[in-house]
């Protein structure tokens, strides 16, 4: 089961509505769902909340170290409570996924994301879960920094928020450790199409009876 949910972002009102803070938005939504409040915890360099689910403690964390030092916060809490990497989920903004979509994966490279890069370094492994929240790509690599540190257009913000609400449907499965189900829930962005009713078979013509 996932015992530590982390959302990545930058602290401060000037960053609050920027694309790079999509992970913070996800944790805020999860905190509302679990009816807990994030409070400052200096020992873990972040805003922290604890929820009790089926007798187990579950932690929510928003590092307040700025993005590039996120691993300092994640590692401090994970080590204190002896939470292994495979029981950590990090929600973060993802350039390679369009707004309106999210993807769940375990392990892999940091793909240039500085928050993930520092978590890799501080945990000593990449073997943790990520919830990749699509923010789209500006199309030009040189524009990436400006892109992530700017507010999305209102229609894009709506799409990102929709993907956050959709992916939250998976949190009970994440808490239960049913990662296959959680992945299916996150990746299924549209309800399946109803099966098309087969046309009624033409009624067979009555056969002529033998004389």
Swiss-Prot record:
It catalyses: an N-acyl-L-alpha-aminoacyl-tRNA + H2O = an N-acyl-L-amino acid + a tRNA + H(+). It is found in: Cytoplasm. The keyword tRNA-binding applies. The record marks 10 as: Discriminates between blocked and unblocked aminoacyl-tRNA. Pfam families: Pept_tRNA_hydro (PF01195). Its main location: cytoplasm. It comes from the Bacteria. GO terms for biological process: protein quality control for misfolded or incompletely synthesized proteins; rescue of stalled ribosome. PROSITE patterns: PEPT_TRNA_HYDROL_2. The active site is at 20 (proton acceptor). InterPro entries: Pept_tRNA_hydro, Pept_tRNA_hydro_CS, Pept_tRNA_hydro_sf. GO terms for molecular function: peptidyl-tRNA hydrolase activity; tRNA binding. CDD domains: PTH. Residues 189-211 are annotated as: Disordered. The record marks 93 as: Stabilizes the basic form of H active site to accept a proton. NCBIfam families: pth. Monomer. Belongs to the PTH family. This is Peptidyl-tRNA hydrolase. It comes from Acidovorax sp. (strain JS42).
